[in-house]
Amino acid sequence: IGHHAVLITIPGSDASLRPCLYMSHQDVVPVVEGTEQDWTHPAFSGDIADGYIWGRGTLDIKEQVFGVLEAAEYLLARGKSFARTAYLAFGDDEETINLGALAIAEHLKAQGVTLEFVLDEGGCKIEPGTAFGAPETSIVSVQLMEKGYADLELSVHSIGGHSSRPYGGTSLGRLSGAIADITRAPFAVRLNSAMTGAFETLAPYITEEPLKTLVR
């Protein structure tokens, strides 16, 4: 789809169930020219050594691409059937302009597909629960929501003139002020259902203040 994006469909047996989508991306961040010698193993070698696969993109995010494909192949090879249709979607330019993901989304929209859920990268590692006040507990964050974003285009019109006799400030100054106003107006912080559930689950393991008192 698009340039080199890939969309694989595994049909489900129950048409009443909305399909799910497992997503990742094939591309990786490039290696800066002149730094090739700084890598323990060649950046694109995929060397297997010391119990690890070495290379650019092994964690961002080739392991998820191969993990999803390996899991699907494993189940299908053993005759596993799916009640819910599953889509495996792999963009090819996530690190740059995301046209691959856009092409996949537009294709699914044109087909009238409404998804039950999307499983994407992020929060997929075991780490100490320090951020939750539970440093002695290991956690894996399951991210249930996605932050949105907005693109803003600001235009300023001002009276022309000479820098020696500015009239009412410069366009650049006014534009900078508008950008500063936006920066000083972040969205209000709120405790949503996902975070509430996380704290309720972790409450017995939280040992650090002030969270220890707040979750009791």
For the regions a protein language model found, what residue spans apply to each?
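Short, solvent-exposed loop/turn segments at the edges of secondary structure
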Residues: 3, 17, 41, 83, ...
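A generic structural motif
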Residues: 59, 158-164
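Acidic-enriched catalytic cores of C-N bond-cleaving enzymes acting on peptides and small amides
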Residues: 108-111, 116, 124-137, 142-151, ...
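Acidic/His- and Gly-rich active-site-bordering loop/insert found
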Residues: 1-58, 65, 75-82
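Aromatic-acidic/polar surface patches that form glycan- and anion
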Residues: 57-61, 168-171
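Active-site-proximal beta-strand/loop segments in catalytic clefts of secreted hydrolases
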Residues: 10-11, 24-26, 90-92, 121-123, ...
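Acidic/histidine-rich catalytic neighborhood of metal-dependent amide-processing enzymes
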Residues: 52-53, 59-141
